[in-house]
A protein has these predicted regions:
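Interfacial aromatic-anchored transmembrane helix boundaries in multi-pass membrane proteins
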Residues: 41-52, 80-111
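Short helix-perturbing small/polar motifs within transmembrane alpha-helices
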Residues: 2-17, 24, 38, 93-151
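Hydrophobic transmembrane alpha-helices
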Residues: 2-73
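Helix-loop junctions at the membrane-solvent interface of multi-pass transporters
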Residues: 38, 42, 66, 85, ...
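Residue-level signature of transmembrane alpha-helical entry/exit and packing/kink sites
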Residues: 21-29, 53-60, 72, 99, ...
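Alpha-helical transmembrane segments in multi-pass membrane proteins
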Residues: 28-39, 60, 64, 75-83, ...
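Membrane-embedded alpha-helical hairpins and interfacial helices in multi-pass inner-membrane proteins
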Residues: 49, 93, 121-195
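Structural signal for the C-terminal ends of transmembrane alpha-helices
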Residues: 66-70, 113-122, 190-194
């Protein structure tokens, strides 16, 4: 007589084990932090500002979109914590609470909003054009959120006026952020494949 394994067999219980789910989540958070670290190394320094053009914001959009809000935000929080204690995880393999550290804090906001955008994408019942338009708007919002802590930190760290902080830390990056947001919208469908 041939019997089917029950859903409570040893193998079955491992695949649905809360402990295994926590290990998987931890692994995904670490992978997200690694992605933020490695992709964040891609920078173009600008001679007129301490803030470089960075692919870190694109990485935060991608990590949030693929891993979801919770795991994406935890990945960014871990990156920020490592940087704060001096680990070389920031652009140029630097660490510490440098003048651009506020943007790293902003990666948490980006990941939260991008993760939410992926959820909205997966539940959106409209046409593909409507889904893409909604996705782009949400990814633009996610990308823009980095400027709240980024500009505040830049202003405080440099002692600059608000107008100077905006000209150093926002204006040069608007076009690039729009492009990154549009491209990152293509990652939104990946979230439904990674639960």
């Amino acid at each position: 007589m041939v019997t089917k394994p029950s859903s409570t067999s040893a193998a079955g219980s491992l695949t649905h084990s809360p402990a295994l789910a926590h290990v998987r989540d931890a692994g995904l958070v670490l992978a997200g932090t690694l992605a933020l670290t490695l992709i964040g190394q891609i920078t173009i320094p600008l001679p007129f500002t301490p803030v470089p053009i960075s692919m870190g914001t694109f990485a935060a959009l991608g990590v949030g979109a693929v891993l979801g809000s919770r795991r994406g935000a935890l990945s960014a929080l871990l990156l920020g914590a490592l940087a704060a204690v001096g680990a070389p995880v920031l652009a140029g393999w630097s660490g510490g609470t440098v003048v651009t550290f506020g943007y790293v804090v902003g990666y948490v906001l980006i990941a939260l909003i991008a993760g939410r955008a992926a959820t909205v994408w997966s539940r959106h019942s409209g046409s593909m054009a409507s889904r893409v338009a909604t996705g782009v708007v949400l990814m633009l919002l996610a990308s823009a959120s980095v400027y709240v802590p980024g500009l505040i930190w830049l202003k405080v760290a440099t002692g600059a006026s608000w107008s100077t902080a905006l000209s150093l830390g926002l204006v040069p990056f608007i076009v690039g952020d729009i492009l990154k947001s549009v491209v990152a919208t293509g990652l939104l469908p990946a979230r439904s494949r990674l639960r």
